[in-house]
């Protein structure tokens, strides 16, 4: 699959700023500093489309990118980068803004075909588990992407993925994808899962 174009569209600080139109949407959510921006750049084969920050919690808005590919089901779609959660040093006023913004997006987007929950391969936190439970409670069945697996030894990866399945209550082996933004491991699997989600939506 070829990526013809990937461009930043807007940052949304309020629900009325969310994109309108008929394009399908894929949303990425995860803990601050989980490697979300690096993964997005890797997935789209772009160096700095999503800005990578050394300061956790830097993403404070719903950032929208428009993607064009050669795939029939994903020829045009929005990739949505949601604010990272769980970083204590972010001002409380900002954190209080994130919650309603995230909830409004995840509850109200009929074009949303897949939520991708990113978890760090080195630790699954209580907030990760709470986010997983909340997403399920509002009708989403998140795809789990385990980031930074290049930092683990081969034998550690198998054990880590098994533990994440258990910790998040995910039985489907295909619903957890180990990913490395450094090596590209997991990239094809992630694209495959997104194509399947888009295909299912078209068949409905």
Q: What residue ranges belong to the model's regions?
A:
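Alpha-helix termini
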Residues: 69-73, 109, 200-203
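Conserved G1/Walker A P-loop phosphate-binding module
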Residues: 1-87
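Residue-level signal for inorganic ion chemistry
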Residues: 65, 147, 190
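Canonical P-loop GTPase G-domain recognition
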Residues: 3-16, 151-204
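Conserved C-terminal guanine-recognition region of P-loop GTPase G domains, centered on the G4
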Residues: 100-174
């Amino acid at each position: 699959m070829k990526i013809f174009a990937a461009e930043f569209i807007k940052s949304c600080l309020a629900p009325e700023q969310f994109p309108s139109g008929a394009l399908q949407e894929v949303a990425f959510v995860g803990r601050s500093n989980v490697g979300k921006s690096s993964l997005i750049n890797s997935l789209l084969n772009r160096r700095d489309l999503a800005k990578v920050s050394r300061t956790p919690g830097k993403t404070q808005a719903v950032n929208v990118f428009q993607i064009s590919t050669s795939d029939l089901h994903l020829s045009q779609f929005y990739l949505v980068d949601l604010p990272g959660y769980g970083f204590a040093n972010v001002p409380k006023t900002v954190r209080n803004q994130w919650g309603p913004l995230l909830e409004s997006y995840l509850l109200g987007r009929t074009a949303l075909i897949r939520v991708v929950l990113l978890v760090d391969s080195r630790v699954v936190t209580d907030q990760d588990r709470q986010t997983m439970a909340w997403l399920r409670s509002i009708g989403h069945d998140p795809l789990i992407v385990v980031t930074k697996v290049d930092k683990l030894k081969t034998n550690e990866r198998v054990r880590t993925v098994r533990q994440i399945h258990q910790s998040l209550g995910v039985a489907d082996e295909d619903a957890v994808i180990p990913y490395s933004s450094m090596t590209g491991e997991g990239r094809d699997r992630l694209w495959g899962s997104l194509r399947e989600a888009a295909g299912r939506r078209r068949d409905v």
